[in-house]
């Protein structure tokens, strides 16, 4: 009886909560409920932390050079497209970079922003292959808690962003992230091409700097919410989540920077059998 009552309460809570969702995305892929993505992400975590390593335990690592080159440069092109769309749907066509609220209209620009937000959300599922490639190549040391957490939490939280607040100042971090990913995955693409291209990877340290700048800009931009008394952004809870996430990764990357470049400890080699070792977000 108690379980039945709890279930009923949960269903009522969900119904009351979901009624405020954006109807424009109701019938889009993966957007009807959070359950499909939760199942996908659960299977991803199970595969990369348990099933995959067990299946590969007595097997040789897969040779995935061509697949990784194709994958990385595809992400570069996809990120260029998403960055352009974020600019054209708001960030370069009217947003103030201050209190930019969500436009829930059916206008072409508003719908372009919604579509771009969904593309960004979907791209996070494509990026799960980062970890799958690690597992298939038996690079299990790179499948860290932080890596898996990041690749799981990004699509899961972005579902709520697209469902309720596709646009406005909560998308600035996505604009920056797509721009950074253009550079990052270009770097990984060169890495995947083998040792012959190592001479073109002298700018690895600057890649870390770029990621640090990304988190600083995200934190500063979102931090404006505390100083804008009349900002009527519809879902401020999302801004607090973004700011918390930005601060956490800013601290993690500062620690990485200090350990790698200031304290004098040696970094892992940029290339190992033609493959990169690097943090990326």
Swiss-Prot record:
<keyword id="KW-0808">Transferase</keyword>
<feature type="disulfide bond">
    <location>
        <begin position="99"/>
        <end position="231"/>
    </location>
</feature>
<keyword id="KW-0256">Endoplasmic reticulum</keyword>
<feature type="transmembrane region" description="Helical; Name=5">
    <location>
        <begin position="177"/>
        <end position="197"/>
    </location>
</feature>
<feature type="active site" description="Nucleophile">
    <location>
        <position position="150"/>
    </location>
</feature>
<keyword id="KW-0443">Lipid metabolism</keyword>
<dbReference type="GO" id="GO:0034625">
    <property type="term" value="P:fatty acid elongation, monounsaturated fatty acid"/>
</dbReference>
<feature type="transmembrane region" description="Helical; Name=7">
    <location>
        <begin position="237"/>
        <end position="257"/>
    </location>
</feature>
<feature type="transmembrane region" description="Helical; Name=4">
    <location>
        <begin position="143"/>
        <end position="162"/>
    </location>
</feature>
<dbReference type="InterPro" id="IPR033670">
    <property type="entry name" value="ELOVL7"/>
</dbReference>
<dbReference type="GO" id="GO:0005783">
    <property type="term" value="C:endoplasmic reticulum"/>
</dbReference>
<keyword id="KW-0275">Fatty acid biosynthesis</keyword>
<keyword id="KW-0812">Transmembrane</keyword>
<comment type="subunit">
    <text>Homodimer. Interacts with TECR.</text>
</comment>
<feature type="topological domain" description="Cytoplasmic">
    <location>
        <begin position="137"/>
        <end position="142"/>
    </location>
</feature>
<feature type="binding site">
    <location>
        <position position="204"/>
    </location>
    <ligand>
        <name>3-oxoeicosanoyl-CoA</name>
    </ligand>
</feature>
<feature type="transmembrane region" description="Helical; Name=1">
    <location>
        <begin position="28"/>
        <end position="48"/>
    </location>
</feature>
<keyword id="KW-0276">Fatty acid metabolism</keyword>
<feature type="binding site">
    <location>
        <position position="137"/>
    </location>
    <ligand>
        <name>3-oxoeicosanoyl-CoA</name>
    </ligand>
</feature>
<feature type="binding site">
    <location>
        <position position="147"/>
    </location>
    <ligand>
        <name>3-oxoeicosanoyl-CoA</name>
    </ligand>
</feature>
<feature type="binding site">
    <location>
        <position position="139"/>
    </location>
    <ligand>
        <name>3-oxoeicosanoyl-CoA</name>
    </ligand>
</feature>
<feature type="binding site">
    <location>
        <position position="266"/>
    </location>
    <ligand>
        <name>3-oxoeicosanoyl-CoA</name>
    </ligand>
</feature>
<feature type="transmembrane region" description="Helical; Name=3">
    <location>
        <begin position="116"/>
        <end position="136"/>
    </location>
</feature>
<feature type="modified residue" description="N-acetylalanine">
    <location>
        <position position="2"/>
    </location>
</feature>
<feature type="short sequence motif" description="Di-lysine motif">
    <location>
        <begin position="277"/>
        <end position="281"/>
    </location>
</feature>
<dbReference type="GO" id="GO:0019367">
    <property type="term" value="P:fatty acid elongation, saturated fatty acid"/>
</dbReference>
<feature type="binding site">
    <location>
        <position position="124"/>
    </location>
    <ligand>
        <name>3-oxoeicosanoyl-CoA</name>
    </ligand>
</feature>
<comment type="pathway">
    <text>Lipid metabolism; fatty acid biosynthesis.</text>
</comment>
<dbReference type="GO" id="GO:0005789">
    <property type="term" value="C:endoplasmic reticulum membrane"/>
</dbReference>
<dbReference type="GO" id="GO:0009922">
    <property type="term" value="F:fatty acid elongase activity"/>
</dbReference>
<feature type="binding site">
    <location>
        <position position="211"/>
    </location>
    <ligand>
        <name>3-oxoeicosanoyl-CoA</name>
    </ligand>
</feature>
<feature type="topological domain" description="Lumenal">
    <location>
        <begin position="163"/>
        <end position="176"/>
    </location>
</feature>
<dbReference type="InterPro" id="IPR030457">
    <property type="entry name" value="ELO_CS"/>
</dbReference>
<feature type="transmembrane region" description="Helical; Name=6">
    <location>
        <begin position="207"/>
        <end position="227"/>
    </location>
</feature>
<feature type="transmembrane region" description="Helical; Name=2">
    <location>
        <begin position="73"/>
        <end position="93"/>
    </location>
</feature>
<feature type="topological domain" description="Cytoplasmic">
    <location>
        <begin position="258"/>
        <end position="281"/>
    </location>
</feature>
<feature type="topological domain" description="Lumenal">
    <location>
        <begin position="94"/>
        <end position="115"/>
    </location>
</feature>
<feature type="topological domain" description="Cytoplasmic">
    <location>
        <begin position="49"/>
        <end position="72"/>
    </location>
</feature>
<keyword id="KW-0472">Membrane</keyword>
<feature type="topological domain" description="Lumenal">
    <location>
        <begin position="228"/>
        <end position="236"/>
    </location>
</feature>
<keyword id="KW-0007">Acetylation</keyword>
<comment type="function">
    <text>Catalyzes the first and rate-limiting reaction of the four reactions that constitute the long-chain fatty acids elongation cycle. This endoplasmic reticulum-bound enzymatic process allows the addition of 2 carbons to the chain of long- and very long-chain fatty acids (VLCFAs) per cycle. Condensing enzyme with higher activity toward C18 acyl-CoAs, especially C18:3(n-3) acyl-CoAs and C18:3(n-6)-CoAs. Also active toward C20:4-, C18:0-, C18:1-, C18:2- and C16:0-CoAs, and weakly toward C20:0-CoA. Little or no activity toward C22:0-, C24:0-, or C26:0-CoAs.</text>
</comment>
């Amino acid at each position: 009886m108690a379980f039945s009552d709890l279930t009923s309460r949960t269903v009522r809570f969900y119904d009351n909560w979901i009624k405020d969702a954006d109807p424009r995305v109701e019938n889009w892929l993966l957007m009807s409920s959070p359950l499909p993505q939760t199942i996908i992400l659960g299977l991803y975590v199970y595969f990369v932390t348990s099933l995959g390593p067990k299946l590969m335990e007595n097997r040789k690592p897969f040779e995935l050079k061509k697949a990784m080159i194709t994958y990385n440069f595809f992400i570069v092109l996809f990120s260029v497209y998403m960055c352009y769309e974020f600019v054209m749907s708001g960030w370069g066509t009217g947003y103030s970079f201050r209190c930019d609220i969500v436009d829930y209209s059916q206008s072409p620009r508003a719908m372009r922003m919604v579509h771009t937000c969904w593309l960004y959300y979907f791209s996070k599922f494509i990026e799960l292959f980062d970890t799958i490639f690690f597992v298939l190549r038996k690079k299990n040391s790179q499948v860290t808690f932080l890596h898996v957490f990041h690749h799981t939490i990004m699509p899961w939280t972005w579902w709520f962003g697209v469902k309720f607040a596709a646009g406005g100042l909560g998308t600035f971090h996505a604009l920056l992230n797509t721009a950074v990913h253009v550079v990052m995955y270009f770097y990984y693409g060169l890495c995947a091409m083998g040792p012959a291209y190592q001479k073109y990877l002298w700018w690895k340290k600057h890649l870390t700097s770029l990621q640090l700048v990304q988190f600083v800009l995200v934190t500063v931009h979102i931090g404006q919410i505390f100083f804008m008394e009349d900002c009527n952004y519809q879902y401020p809870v999302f801004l607090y989540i973004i700011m918390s996430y930005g601060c956490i990764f800013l601290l993690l990357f500062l620690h990485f920077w200090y350990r790698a470049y200031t304290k004098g400890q040696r970094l892992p080699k940029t290339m190992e059998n033609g493959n990169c070792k690097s943090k990326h977000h």
